[in-house]
Every structure is written in structure tokens, then in C-alpha cells.
């Protein structure tokens, strides 16, 4: 019977952790071999067990605290809460303030993040209630006697709402200033294409995979400088087109803008051929051979002018390749 039961302590077969000097011993089963190694005083062991005991105390980073649970229960009673305790691991949605909770289990980190968010929102709501209560007291519309703590609130000498007073009523002469164009109030959701040229945020961030107007012909610059100049050229060209279309409503406060040079947007140049890695279409390039790619694509648009009256397929036509 003693040989049927492995004595304690021993490691269960299938344990994938480290056991000192186990790989140097042979001839016994895993359980008996680890039993000999664990009780051998000549073998250096760790001062404490790696695996925590079953009856170990619950750590602060393993489970949410009582204060956090109280905040979550109060929140569920006030609003239709999406985040209900416990927030199970595997939830792929957004959890507020979860990123700042480091070294905790998912349930503890998510509960702490939501509790912190609810505490901050409660401070905002308390401040909002204080401001509304103070405005009600200052306006004189309250039908109740002010308490001691209400008397300590900061007050002004004026009753709200205030009455607008012009400069003439004060005896001050109005200054005649030329009309100014109001600057558009841009928000953080405004596209950088329509920001002012002087705006520091008028550029495209790295990783943007959409079309950036007038950026094809620019190179050798950083992404911020390149996209800023491209967007400035685009907005200038857009205002130029608007002025040409609506001459009566042109904005005279902006300097005159000229159309960008057409040479920047020419694909087939008359004095040079295409680069060998160009993967686009070149007119007549399929029916030419015996020359380099640059010589073949030299002045490519001339092929269309020479064969503009072509009525049959180029394969069966008597084409002129001598140009």
C-alpha cells in the first residue's frame, strides 16, 4: 500500500514549472522523484513556495474594494448603467480609466476605473448644482430664506440677468472702425483642409491613408511640413476658383492668389521620358520595342496626336513608329 500512494510532498505529473535537479535524475516516477528532491536538505530550494496556498488572503489588486463596490451600486441605482459589477474579462468595449490601472486583474481594474470615473462625474455634478443654486440666490427668484452656508457663497453687486449698456449711454463716443470679417469658429472636428493657413493644426497626421490634395509632386520634406504646404496650396487654389466664379463676393481681406503652375501636374512631359518604375498607362508604349523605357515614353502624348484618326485596331493598322 505504501508503494501505491506517493508520499507528500510531491509535484503532480504534468507540472510544467521548475524543479531543482529533476532533469539530472532518472529511474523513478515523477511523483517519487520530486518527493526525494523536495525533502533533500542538500538541494537548494526557494525560501517559500511559488504557488500561493489555497487559504491565502485576498490581495488588493485581485478584487475591487468595498468603497468601489459601493460606488458602483449607487451608480446602478441612479442611471441605466452599462458597466455592472462584475465586468467579465473579454469585454471588448471601452472602460473608462482602465488604462491607468496597472498590475490588477481585469475585474479589479475595470471596477476601479469605473468607480474613479463616477467619483469625478459626481464632483462635476456637485459643482454644477452649486453654480445653479448661487445664480438662483443672486437673481432674487428664490422663495426661501437663505441659510448660513448660502450666505457664505461668493456674490456680486449686480442682479442677473444684466442689462446691456451701449457706449453712447455711458457718454463715450463710438469709434468708427472698418468692418472686419469674422473668423470662423473651428472645432476639433473640423477637417484640416478648411483651417486657416496660419493655424498650427493644418497638417495631416502620419498613418492617414486618404487622399491628400496637391501632395503628389512634393517630396524630400517631413510629413508635417509636406502636408501643411499641400493643404495651403489646396485652400489657395480653392479660394482662387471661388473668386473666378463669384467675382462680386470675393474676399478682399485675403491677398491675391495665383493658380498653381500647371507644370506640377503634367504626367507625360515633352522633354523627358517616364521613370522605369512607372506603373501607369502610357499611350502607344505597348506597340513600341527595341528602345529603353525612357526613350519609348518620350513625349507620349504625341502618339495620340499622330494616330488620332485611327479607325482600326493598332495591331492591324500601318502605324508610324518613326516619330
Curated annotation (Swiss-Prot):
Q: Where would one find the signal peptide in this protein?
A: none
Keywords carried by this UniProt record: Cell projection, Cytoplasm, Cytoskeleton
Q: Does the keyword GTP-binding apply?
A: no
The keyword Cytoplasm is assigned to this record: yes
Q: Cellular component per GO? A: cell projection; cytoplasm; microtubule cytoskeleton
Q: Where in the cell is it found?
A: Cytoplasm, Cytoskeleton, Cilium axoneme
| InterPro entries listed in its UniProt record | CMI2A-C-like_dom
Question: What family name appears in the similarity comment?
Answer: Belongs to the CIMIP2 family.
Task: Relate the protein's function as given in its record.
Answer: Probable microtubule inner protein (MIP) part of the dynein-decorated doublet microtubules (DMTs) in cilium axoneme.
**Name listed for the protein in its UniProt record:** CIMIP2 protein CG18335
Q: From what organism does this protein derive? A: Drosophila melanogaster (Fruit fly)
Amino acid at each position: 500500500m505504501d508503494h501505491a500512494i506517493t508520499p507528500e510532498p510531491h509535484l503532480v505529473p504534468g507540472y510544467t514549472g521548475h524543479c531543482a535537479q529533476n532533469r539530472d535524475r532518472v529511474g523513478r516516477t515523477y511523483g517519487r522523484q520530486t518527493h526525494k528532491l523536495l525533502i533533500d536538505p542538500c538541494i537548494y530550494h526557494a525560501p517559500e513556495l511559488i504557488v500561493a496556498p489555497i487559504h491565502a488572503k485576498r490581495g488588493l489588486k485581485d478584487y475591487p474594494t468595498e468603497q468601489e463596490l459601493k460606488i458602483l451600486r449607487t451608480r446602478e441605482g441612479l442611471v441605466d448603467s452599462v458597466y455592472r459589477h462584475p465586468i467579465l474579462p473579454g469585454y471588448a468595449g471601452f472602460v473608462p480609466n482602465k488604462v491607468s490601472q496597472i498590475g490588477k486583474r481585469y475585474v479589479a481594474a475595470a471596477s476601479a476605473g469605473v468607480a474613479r470615473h463616477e467619483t469625478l462625474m459626481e464632483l462635476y455634478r456637485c459643482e454644477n448644482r452649486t453654480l445653479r443654486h448661487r445664480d438662483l440666490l443672486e437673481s432674487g427668484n428664490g422663495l426661501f430664506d437663505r441659510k448660513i452656508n448660502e450666505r457664505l457663497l461668493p456674490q456680486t453687486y449686480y442682479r442677473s440677468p444684466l442689462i446691456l449698456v451701449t457706449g453712447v449711454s455711458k457718454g463715450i463716443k463710438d469709434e468708427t472702425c472698418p468692418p472686419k470679417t469674422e473668423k470662423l469658429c473651428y472645432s476639433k472636428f473640423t477637417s484640416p483642409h478648411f483651417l486657416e493657413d496660419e493655424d498650427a493644426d493644418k497638417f495631416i497626421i502620419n498613418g492617414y491613408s486618404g487622399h491628400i490634395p496637391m501632395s503628389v509632386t512634393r517630396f524630400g520634406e517631413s510629413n508635417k511640413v509636406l502636408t501643411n504646404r499641400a493643404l495651403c496650396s489646396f485652400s489657395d487654389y480653392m479660394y482662387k476658383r471661388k473668386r473666378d466664379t463669384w467675382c462680386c463676393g470675393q474676399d478682399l481681406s485675403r491677398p491675391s492668389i495665383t493658380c498653381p503652375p500647371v507644370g506640377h501636374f503634367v504626367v507625360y512631359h515633352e522633354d523627358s521620358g517616364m521613370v522605369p518604375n512607372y506603373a501607369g498607362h502610357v499611350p502607344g508604349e505597348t506597340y513600341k520595342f527595341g528602345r529603353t523605357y525612357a526613350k519609348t515614353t518620350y513625349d507620349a502624348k504625341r502618339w495620340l496626336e499622330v494616330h488620332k484618326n485611327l479607325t482600326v485596331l493598332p495591331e492591324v493598322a500601318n502605324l508610324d513608329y518613326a516619330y
